[in-house]
Amino acid sequence: TFSGPCAYHDRADEMTETTLLQTIDSPADLRKLPVEKLSDVAREIRSYIIECVSHTGGHLSSSLGSVELALALHYVFNTPDDRLVWDVGHQAYAHKILTGRREGLKRVRQYKGLSGFPRRDESEYDAFGTAHSSTSISAALGMAVASHLEGHDKRWHIAVIGDGALTGGMASEALNHAGDYKEGVRLLIILNDNNCSISPPVGALCGHLGKLVSTSPFWKMRNLGKSILKNTPTLHELAKRVEKQTVNFLSPPSSIFSTYDLNYFGPIDGHDVVGLVRMLTKLRDLEGPMGPIVLHVRTVKGKGYEPAEKDPTTYH
C-alpha cells in the first residue's frame, strides 16, 4: 500500500482535469462513448487515481495496472447484471470510479469514506466482498452455477485474478471444479498477469493461434462438428482428443488450463483497450456450449506513473 508523497502531492487543492470522466457516472454512460475514446478515458482515470492516492494513500500500482481492463469489462459486459469479481480487490479503483464512486475516491480508506476493496454493501456493482487472495474464481463459479439453476443462462460471471493469486490452493480447486462444467455456465476467468509468474509464451505461433481460435468462424465450425458427431460416439471421442492435442501442441501456455479442460485464449496486451474490447466482445458473443473460458492478459503494475513502474512493490 502506498502512503507516501508523490509528484502530484504539491497540487493539493487542484484535481486533474477529467473532461470525459466527469460525464461517466455509471457503466451505461461509458458505453455511450465510441470505443476510440476509451484510451482518453484511461489517461484521465490514471491521473485521477494518482491525484487521489497522493492525498489519501492506498493501492496505487495495482490499480494503475488494471485501468484498461476495468474499462473494457464494463464497456463490453452488462454490469451489474453480469457479475464482476475482483480477486483481492486492491486493483479495483478504476472499477469504483466507473461505477458511480468517482467523487468518493477522494476519501478512499478514510473515515466514512470508500472502502479500499469491493464491498457488496457499498455498490451493486461489487458482486463479492474481497480482500483475501485466490477467492474470485470460486465466488464467480458459484454465482454462475446459481444463475444457471435459476434459468439466467445469458448472464456472464467474470473473475479477475492475478498470476500470484492463481498459485493459491483455493484458486486451483476452483479451476479443477470449473472444468467439470461443459455448458450452461457462463464463466470468464481473466488472468491478470503482471509479474511473469507464469512462463511466457513460446514462439510466434502461440500468438497466431490466439488470433485464430478467438474468431467466431473457428467456434462455429467447432460446434457444427460437435453437433454432427454427437450421435456417433466413437468419432466424437476421437475428434475431442484430436482437438485437445492440437491446441496443446500449438499453444504451450494453455497446457496448464487444458489440464483442467478450460478454454484458453491469449496472452493479449492488457493496456490496448481497443484490443481488449474486441477480444472480450468476441468471447461474449461465442455461440454454442463451450464451458468456462480463461483469457490471459499481460499488464504492467504502476502503468503510467514511472516511479510505480520502476518500484511496484513500494507503490503497491
Residue locations for each model-derived region?
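Short, positively charged and aromatic/hydrophobic N-terminal segments
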Residues: T1-A12
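N-terminal amphipathic, basic-rich helices that act as targeting or association modules
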Residues: M15-T99, I256-L262, G266-R278, E287, ...
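Structural signal for hydrophobic packing residues in well-ordered secondary-structure cores
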Residues: I45-I49, V53, L73-D81, R101-L105, ...
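Cofactor-binding active-site loop characterized by glycine-rich and histidine/acidic residues
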Residues: H59-Y181
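Short beta-strand segments
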Residues: D87, V160-I161, L188-N192, H296-K301
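Residue-level preference for the first positions of well-ordered beta-strands
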Residues: W156-I158, R186-L188, M290-V294
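A short alpha/beta connector and helix-capping loop motif
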Residues: G168-N192, L205-S214, A308
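Long, well-ordered, tryptophan-enriched scaffold segments
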Residues: N195-H316
